[in-house]
């Protein structure tokens, strides 16, 4: 096996080029053109046969060892063993194709040997014809020599006659010897031909056996290739399953990675939340410290308020003293009113008098001036303050800025007033709540009272004003601190909620991780159990099947691959963990840096606060510290910190997204999907284009078939082809048949490609076959197979047409045979002729070939001066009738030969049609039809033999030699019949063998279909299992996702990812379905390939049948040659009879001359006297000598035959010549009757000597005419032979051109088909 692999490894590259084509090339000229190469001997053929048998035995041994070695290979079904088996199968295919090529070369050599034998037979026939022509020329020469003698004296004549008779006898003996030799040579040639034919038949039988064996080997190879393809398909399906498993593993790994990333993100978010909580705790602690400080300050302020209330109580006691001073205040108010009128333009505060009791003690801003009224009691003042808080809050905002200073000392105090100065110090205080407003108003009233008291006591009010401003500031800071505390509490609550959610999410993810680990452990346990179960049958000693062994190997391979993939994924996970650690470290560093910077800022602020506390007095220390803390934790800075945290979170999210994009190449997947869609669209467009091309090709082939049918119908009409010759008609018929076959083969190829044509018509093309054919279309019928459709559409009309043509030809033959007897009788009757005296005797003597010229021109003969008036009626009539019968027989034989050729052509067409019907699996019916055709041919041959025997009996040739020849012919015919019977038996045996082969092929196809169905069922079951597993997995994932969604809203992202996985799984299922469709398409293509191989086998059988047809053609040619030899023999016998008659007449004339009786009455009707007769004889002898010496005595007339180029014109000329001769004979007979009627008494007075003289002259003239006729016929035969040869050459050239054109078109179609297949 290894040696065969190494020897034929170079042939594996050319497997696509090697095609098992069984086309046997015929010679270019048909049966007439011999090949230059010589045939092989029987010994060489036997040696080749022995070598082929050895090769066949070696191939069988190789197949047997391959079949024995298959179970082990199946047990070891690995990829390497399968590849080795594929290589071995390819090598065997190459070797088998080589053997097929060698056997095709043997078939070609056999065809060449047949053509060589035909050439040898043709050469032998030509040599025999040349010998016969030489003998005829010698006879003519002797006859001319006899006719050239001068009858001066009877003694000289007798001597010459004796000498001539001796020479004639000698020549006859030579002729007999030559004929015997020729017969012996022919017998030897026939014996050699019979041996060669037997050897050829044996070789053909062996070749057929080898072809059958080769077909069996090809079938075995197809089976092996089918098994290899099935194994490849199984491997592909397993690869697809592996890829699906890999994808599932990848999906699981990606899901695990995503879960790990989510865990890491959650851990990071927890860390960040913890950091934020720490920061918030620190801020809360700071705020609590500030609140404590402010509570202390509030306590101190309350103490101060209590002190102020005590003072107010003291002052209430002193109110009585103050009432006494009201007079003074009134006077002062009057003065102020007067001054107000004066100082309106200066914007000085004017104290108006009290208008109403309700308005007492209220103060408002009015266009930059303070209007003050008399004070009220505390209760009423507080009510007034509550009712006018909003007005004060709005109006105070439009007052002067707090930086404005108001002098208090001296005249300024009296100028502006106390309330105006106090309000100028409080105008910058912002809006405060109601409680604080009440408090502030109370304080202001107290301050006013204090101011009034202190004015009376003359104490400065600067310190009190500073305390009020500090009090207002503290209140505002308290409000702001409360608001900030509320916001921080809200943020703290949100952070606690997020931390709780994260903790819940972490717990759920930990549970999921535990579940996944448990599932992985369960799957690992299952795999271990499967491995144990796989190991158990091998350990128990049970023989595993191929499927179990393959599943075991697949499980081990899958486990190894899964382990490798898991290791790789763990390494990747470790790498990713290291990267995540690095990135978390970087993030921690960044966060630490930012925290460190913030701590630095806090330290700086604390230092500034410490410095300010040192500089400020004790009263302002607490407020300054609180203000610094408040500045360090303002809302703007808090928002900035939050924004920074958000930015950091965004950066972390971006980094995680980048990592996820690096792992899941979603963009690449999208691009690949787009490319897939583009490729699918391109494939769809290519399929559409291919279907359109197939439609166009099918329509064109249909139109070609219609045109061929149209031409075929035209060929049936006699009006169209009545002018053409038979050979051209046959050539046209063959061309039309070949075009029909080509269109049918194209239709078969298009039907095999399984393309259904919706519309088989184009707008530019019309249906031409409807002109002469009115049969209905069968295109709308439904058929069970392509072969039945092809048979119903194409083969049935051709078979019917051929049968009708055969019946018409048979009817014409019967009519011709029935009308032949009538024609013979009509031609044997004398025809009336008109005698014209247009020529003189000198013209008649100077133009001895005038009859020939007139016959060729088409005129009747008018010069009858050479005919004797007293010619014998009985002899002329008998000779004319014999000539007429011979001519009629020749005509009939030629016509029968033509008809037989036509029948043979039609039979060839029938055989071709039957060979085409082999494609329809009806070989048994074909063999029956061929048997019927053979029986019909036998009946025709028997009828022809009976007609020939009847003709021979009518002629009266009862000689022994003819009987022997007829018996020999009968024996040959019987042998042919036996051979045909043997051929029939062999054909029936072949048909039975083919039926057995068809049954075996059908069984094999059924087995293959069963295997395919089993494989499809297994694949469907596997797919269902995978679908069920996928559905279960999906359900589990959905359940988990639902639980996760119920636990936490963050699990929606994982649910979306699982939905994407679901889509990917559905796409993978679609991909598997597309793979199933592709596998089905490959199955259909394999079936088409098997059909193509069957078609090639059928073509090989067709070529074998063509070889049989060529053999039958050779037999027909042989029969024609035998007929021709028989005709020549008949001519020789007729010449011998005429020569014997001449000898008898001469002997009679010699007897009369010896008696010495003469008469003067005899010489008168001959024309001139004896001297003139001698001159006339000399002139005739000179003319005859010139005729013998020159090739054409009448150049002007002989050249006419050379000008005519068609075979039909020569036939017409021969027919006209024969009719003219009959007319001349008829013209001679009435002359004789008239002479008999005019001179009845002259016969009794004629002397014997004169009669002999006249008889000799007539015999000489008849001999001369016969020689001329023989020469003319010989030349006519030569001309016709040359024309036939040229026509055959032209026909062969036309056939060669047509073949080349068909081959070119076939190659073009093959290239187109290969290009279309490559594009598809």
Swiss-Prot record:
Coiled-coil intervals, chain numbering: 97-516, 626-654, 712-983
Keyword Glycoprotein on entry: no
Protein keywords: Cell cycle, Cell division, Cell projection, Cilium, Coiled coil, Cytoplasm, Cytoskeleton, Developmental protein, Flagellum, Meiosis, Mitosis, Phosphoprotein
InterPro entries associated with the record: Cnn_1N, MT-associated_AKAP9-binding
Subcellular location: Cytoplasm; Cytoplasm, Cytoskeleton, Microtubule organizing center, Centrosome; Cytoplasm, Cytoskeleton, Flagellum basal body; Cytoplasm, Cytoskeleton, Microtubule organizing center
Keyword Cytoplasm: yes
Role noted for this protein: Core component of the centrosome throughout spermatogenesis. May participate in mitotic spindle assembly and the mechanics of morphogenesis through an interaction with microtubules, either directly or indirectly. Is a target of several homeotic genes.
Name assigned to this protein: Centrosomin
Species name: Drosophila melanogaster
């Amino acid at each position: 096996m290894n040696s065969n692999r190494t020897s034929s490894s170079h042939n594996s590259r050319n497997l696509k080029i090697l095609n098992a084509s069984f086309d046997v090339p015929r010679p270019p000229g048909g049966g007439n053109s011999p090949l230059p190469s010589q045939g092989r001997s029987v010994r060489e053929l036997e040696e080749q046969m022995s070598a082929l048998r050895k090769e066949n035995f070696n191939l069988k041994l190789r197949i047997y060892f391959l079949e024995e070695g298959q179970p082990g290979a199946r047990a070891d079904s690995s990829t390497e063993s399968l590849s080795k088996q594929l290589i071995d199968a390819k090598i065997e295919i190459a070797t088998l194709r080589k053997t097929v090529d060698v056997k095709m070369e043997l078939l070609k050599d056999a065809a060449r040997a047949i053509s060589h034998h035909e050439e040898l037979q043709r050469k032998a026939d030509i040599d025999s014809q040349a010998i016969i022509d030489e003998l005829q020329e010698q006879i003519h020469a002797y006859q001319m020599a006899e006719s050239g003698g001068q009858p001066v004296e009877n003694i000289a004549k007798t001597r010459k006659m004796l000498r001539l008779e001796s020479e004639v006898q000698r020549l006859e003996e030579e002729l007999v010897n030559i004929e015997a030799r020729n017969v012996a040579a022919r017998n030897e040639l026939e014996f050699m031909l019979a041996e060669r034919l037997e050897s050829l038949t044996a070789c053909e039988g062996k070749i057929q056996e080898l072809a059958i064996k080769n077909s069996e080997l090809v079938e075995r190879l197809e089976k092996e290739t089918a098994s290899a393809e099935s194994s490849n398909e199984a491997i592909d399906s397993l690869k697809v399953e592996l890829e699906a498993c890999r994808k599932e593993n990848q999906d699981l790994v990606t899901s695990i990675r995503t879960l790990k990333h989510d865990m890491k993100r959650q851990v990071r978010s927890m860390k960040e939340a913890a950091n934020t909580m720490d920061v918030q705790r620190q801020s809360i602690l700071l705020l609590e410290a500030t609140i404590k400080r402010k509570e202390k300050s509030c306590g101190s302020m309350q103490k101060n308020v209590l002190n102020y209330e005590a003072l107010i109580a003291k002052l209430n006691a002193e109110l009585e003293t103050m009432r006494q001073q009201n007079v003074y205040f009134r006077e002062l108010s009057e003065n102020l009113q007067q001054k107000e009128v004066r100082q309106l333009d200066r914007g000085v505060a004017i104290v108006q008098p009290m208008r109403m009791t309700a308005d007492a003690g209220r103060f408002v801003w009015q266009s930059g001036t303070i209007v003050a009224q008399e004070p009220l009691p505390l209760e009423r003042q507080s009510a007034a303050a509550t009712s006018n808080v909003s007005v004060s809050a709005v109006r105070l905002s439009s007052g002067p800025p707090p930086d404005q200073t108001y002098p208090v000392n001296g005249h300024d105090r009296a100028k502006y007033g106390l309330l105006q100065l106090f309000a100028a110090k409080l105008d910058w205080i912002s809006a405060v709540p109601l409680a604080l407003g009440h408090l502030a108003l109370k304080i202001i009233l107290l301050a006013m009272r204090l101011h009034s008291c202190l004015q009376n006591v003359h104490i400065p009010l600067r310190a009190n004003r500073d305390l009020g401003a500090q009090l207002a500031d503290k209140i505002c800071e308290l409000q702001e601190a409360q608001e900030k505390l509320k916001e921080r509490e809200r943020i703290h609550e949100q952070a606690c909620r997020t931390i709780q959610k994260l903790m819940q999410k972490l717990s759920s993810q930990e549970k999921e991780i535990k579940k996944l680990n448990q599932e992985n452990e369960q799957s690992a346990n299952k795999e271990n159990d499967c491995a144990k179960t796989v190991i158990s049958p091998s350990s128990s000693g049970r023989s595993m099947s191929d499927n179990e062994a393959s599943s075991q190997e697949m499980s081990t391979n899958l486990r190894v691959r899964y382990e490798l993939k898991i290791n790789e994924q763990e390494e990747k996970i470790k790498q990713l963990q290291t990267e995540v650690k690095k990135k978390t470290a970087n993030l921690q560093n960044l966060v630490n840096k930012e925290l460190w910077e913030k701590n630095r800022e806090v330290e700086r602020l604390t230092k500034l606060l410490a410095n300010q506390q040192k500089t400020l007095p004790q009263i302002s220390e607490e407020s300054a510290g609180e203000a610094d803390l408040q500045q360090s934790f303002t809302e703007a800075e808090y928002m900035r910190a939050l924004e920074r945290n958000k930015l950091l979170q965004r950066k972390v999210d971006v980094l995680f997204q980048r990592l996820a994009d690096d792992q899941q190449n979603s963009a690449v997947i999208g691009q690949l999907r787009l490319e897939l869609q583009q490729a699918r669209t391109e494939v769809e467009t290519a399929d559409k284009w291919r279907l359109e091309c197939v439609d166009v090709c099918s329509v064109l082939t249909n139109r070609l078939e219609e045109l061929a049918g149209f031409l075929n119908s035209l060929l049936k009409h006699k009006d169209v082809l009545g002018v053409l010759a038979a050979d051209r008609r046959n050539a046209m018929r063959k061309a039309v048949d070949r075009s029909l076959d080509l269109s049918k083969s194209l239709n078969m190829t298009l039907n095999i490609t399984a393309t259904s044509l919706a519309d088989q018509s184009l707008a530019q093309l019309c249906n031409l076959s409807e002109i002469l054919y009115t049969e209905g279309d069968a295109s709308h019928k439904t058929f069970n197979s392509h072969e039945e459709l092809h048979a119903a559409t194409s083969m049935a009309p051709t078979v019917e047409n051929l049968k009708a043509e055969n019946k018409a030809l048979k009817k014409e033959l019967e009519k011709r045979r029935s009308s032949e007897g009538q024609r013979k009788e009509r031609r044997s009757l004398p025809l009336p002729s008109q005698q014209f005296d247009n020529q003189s005797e000198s013209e008649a003597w100077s133009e001895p070939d005038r009859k020939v010229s007139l016959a060729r021109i088409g005129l009747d003969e008018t010069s009858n001066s050479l005919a004797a008036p007293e010619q014998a009626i009985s002899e002329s009539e008998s000779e004319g009738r014999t000539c007429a019968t011979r001519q009629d027989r020749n005509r009939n034989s030629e016509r029968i030969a033509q008809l037989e050729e036509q029948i043979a052509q039609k039979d060839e067409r029938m055989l071709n049609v039957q060979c085409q019907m082999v494609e329809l699996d009806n070989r048994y019916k074909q063999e029956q039809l061929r048997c019927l055709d053979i029986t019909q041919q036998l009946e025709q041959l028997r009828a022809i033999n009976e007609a020939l025997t009847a003709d021979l009996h009518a002629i009266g040739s009862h000689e022994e030699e003819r009987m022997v020849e007829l018996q020999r012919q009968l024996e040959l015919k019987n042998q042919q019949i036996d051979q045909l019977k043997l051929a029939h038996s062999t054909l029936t045996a072949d048909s039975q063998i083919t039926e057995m082969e068809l049954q075996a092929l059908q069984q094999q196809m059924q087995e293959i279909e069963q295997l395919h169905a089993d494989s499809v069922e297994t694949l469907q079951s596997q797919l269902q299992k995978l679908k069920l597993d996928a559905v279960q997995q999906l359900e589990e994932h959905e359940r988990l996702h639902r639980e996760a969604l119920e636990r936490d809203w963050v699990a929606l992202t994982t649910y979306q990812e699982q939905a994407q996985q679901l889509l990917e799984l559905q796409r993978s299922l679609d991909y598997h379905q597309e793979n199933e469709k592709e596998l089905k398409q490959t199955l259909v293509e394999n079936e088409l390939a098997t059909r193509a191989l069957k078609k090639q086998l059928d073509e090989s059988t067709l070529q074998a049948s063509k070889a049989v047809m060529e053999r039958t053609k050779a037999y027909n040619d042989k029969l024609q040659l035998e007929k021709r030899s028989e005709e020549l023999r008949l001519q020789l016998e007729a010449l011998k009879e005429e020569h014997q008659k001449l000898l008898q007449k001469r002997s009679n004339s010699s007897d009369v001359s010896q008696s010495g009786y003469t008469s003067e009455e005899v010489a008168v009707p001959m024309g001139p006297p004896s001297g003139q007769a001698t001159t006339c004889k000399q002139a005739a002898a000179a003319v005859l000598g010139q005729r013998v010496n020159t090739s054409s005595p009448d150049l002007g007339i002989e050249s006419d035959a050379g000008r005519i180029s068609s075979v039909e014109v020569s036939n017409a000329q021969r027919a006209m010549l024969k009719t003219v001769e009959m007319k001349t004979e008829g013209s001679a007979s009435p002359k004789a009757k008239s002479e008999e009627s005019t001179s009845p008494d002259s016969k009794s007075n004629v002397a014997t000597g004169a009669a002999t003289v006249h008889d000799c002259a007539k015999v000489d003239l008849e001999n001369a005419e016969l020689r001329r006729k023989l020469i003319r016929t010989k030349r006519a035969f030569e001309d016709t032979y040359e024309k036939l040869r040229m026509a055959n050459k032209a026909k062969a050239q036309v056939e060669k051109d047509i073949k080349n054109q068909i081959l070119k078109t076939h190659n073009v179609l093959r290239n187109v088909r290969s290009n279309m297949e490559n594009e598809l």
